[in-house]
Amino acid sequence: RVLFRSYMAVIDGQLVVPCGTQLPALFNLASGKLEKYTTGWGGRVGLPKGTWFVAGSGQLLSHSGDLYDMRRPNDEKFANSGNRRDFKSKLYPGFMTRIQVEPTNQKSIGDFRRPVLSNNTMFYTDNGIVAEDISEIKLTPRQADPRRDQDKYPDKWQASFPRRWKLETDLRVRIQAGNRVYCTAPGKVAAIDLPAADGQPRISWEATIDGDPLTLVAANGRLFVTTRQGRLYAFGASAAPEPVTHARAAHTGNNSSEQVKLITAATGISKGYCLVLGLDNGELAEALSQQFTVIAIDNDADRINRLRSRWHGLGIYGTHITALLGDPLTYNLPPFLANLVVTETARLFNAEAAAEPPANIYHALRPYGGTACLPVALKGRQVWKDSAAKLSNAQVRESGRWLLLSRTGALAQSADWSHAAGGSGNSGSSEDRYLRGPLGLLWYDGSIRWERQPGKTEVRVAGGRIFVRADRMLAIDVFTGRRLWDQPLPQAAGAGKVGEFVATADAIYVAAGRSCVVLDARTGKQRSQFQMPEKIGGSLVHLRLWKNYLVSYLGKTVICLDRQSGQLLWSFEASRPELSLAVGGQRVFISELLNTRRGETIEKSGVKTYALDIATGKQAWQGAGGAELRYSETHDLLLTATAIYKGLDGTVHRKSVIADPTKDKWNYKSSGYIAGDSLLIGGSDNFTMYQLTSGVQLTKKISWFRRGCTPLRTSPYMVTTRYQGQAAYIDLDTMQFQSLWNLRGACSNNIFPANGILNVPNLSGGCTCNYTPTSMALVPRTTLQAQPKK
């Protein structure tokens, strides 16, 4: 639950660890025990917020520009708590008292002060450099500050310290070393001599630099300065010789590079994660690291240490290549990791040593084409082929001296989240039956943060890729979190300009005003652009893709295009522009929506639901409209405001209102979510589950406290939501909640059950709450370890 970030500090006998946007964590130095801690709050005006900075002296802790007394327990209370439980005192680091509040620490954190603290003096920047005596603390009840007159959560106490001196300057104090403090300004570094008691400071020297100073370190009689632009400066009492540049060792020769070319040609794989199971001289692994992220495994400790040293010297260890000590054939590898598996040690795969594929190899291969390229002896290959025939989506082929074992296609019974509401049926669910609880962590990453608000960021999951559309389109590997590509979008297709996009394994269709932009799913590059017919007005919204048909509407006109050519196949005129679309089972379903603000009713408005043949656009049947449509292609059932219909012919499968509720409890007013074989009726913080086909009630009504606006997403065995402020999922097998502790659920719900993975991209941008800004992926725990052969 605690994510360590940046530099730690030992203050008042405790280890203080900054945790990024989380509040800092305090650990007992002797035992390592985590002290009192809270997170997942903040965002309110004036409440503590996490950053990378901690510093301290004596009993004082500085964090985010705020100052805390580590020995004074917090006794804060909400100004408006009423009769509810008051937990304000627990919203501070270590539940200790904040005695000074950084003026910029309001709704969001501005450029907060980073004071320098010595044994009895605090130096900080406030329209100059100020020095105060922190050995004398004067604590008084806080008076209302004009900058916080709208603050519902004011602190009780305010500390003040006797001022030693103030130096009027544009410099900012950064560090103290000896009897000087060192300061910076854009393009400038300076040293200030500290005065004796009652004296005044003076600037000892100044120097100009190229760029904006970022960090300072004083050591060995020198001051080292880095800049934001990537330069390094050193200052000292006397001139120093030119720094020695240590040349990196040369990469390996052409033999291994040629072998890499042969391997990539045989497999068709040229990037991603590569496992090297068994090392010899490390040359093949090293050559592969120029294209792949390589993880090499060998059971010879001396060889591992020798190669680690070499790769450190090349500057590639830990970034391009990693070496692990262990048995290459039994090492406990994570699932779905490897795009490519090779070896430097052919003897591991001769007929005697590996009579059949080791379980961890196929287990580690990435779906959608991960391939092991291994020198399996000819007489042993039939056993590998027989073994692969028993595995789901395994394929074996031969290429000269190599046997190629691939994991093709998707995980069995997994499904995409290709549309805004799951699939083309607008069910609010994916059809993913691979993903089933309990779940375990597959990967996490905090390098990217997208906006959390609905419409600012759109996410789809298809073909083993997470597609994120903000002002650009970016693709991430579902199974590893690896960034695949990042491409700009045409201006009309940027965030906030248009509606949805649809993703498949091969293409992405982006609604872009009067056109539909088609991107290649593998590269992100534009493949084509379909212009809308001039005779049809309006902008393209709410795309639906089913097989070779692309359905959408402009204004009141529903259109169907050939998804390959963009040719208009047919159009249909509805009575109003407020429509809901669901597509599947050879049908296009169109519901004309009610305007509830005007008090419209289904009976008086005459709104309709139409079912059209997707190939011709001819009407198959019609019924009453009024609400969002949900369609299950598996069961050919269409959920509307008045009934559940058979999609093919419009036969009423079940009405929404039961004449005699004493005999049948089925009743609903909203369309709910179709989750596999179940129907979930309720809202964003409650539902009752029914069997879709029979209407039998499966569970009592379940409800929970979200503390946020996250709507539901579903799959046959999962519901994703926000629970007590945390991102969470509900296991529909057990009806148990599982919080993803300290992870924020986005306003638009950032938890997508698809491709066999619970995908959680980091949609927390613009949030000032102290959650961990992290993307992650979870899988069924049963898949985390390779299953031994019986």
Whereabouts are the PLM-identified features?
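Aromatic (tryptophan-biased) beta-strands that constitute blades/sheets of beta-rich domains
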Residues: R1-F4, K33-V45, K49, D69-R114, ...
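Conserved class I S-adenosyl-L-methionine
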Residues: I269-A287, T293-I295
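Conserved SAM-binding loop
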Residues: L307-R308
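Conserved SAM-binding strand-loop segment of SAM-dependent methyltransferases
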Residues: I316-P328
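A short acidic, Gly/Pro-enriched loop at the edge of an enzyme's catalytic core
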Residues: L329-L340
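A short SAM/SAH-binding and catalytic strip from SAM-dependent methyltransferases
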Residues: A338-A354
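A short glycine-rich, Lys/Arg-flanked "PGG" loop and its adjoining helix->strand segment in the class I
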Residues: A351-G370
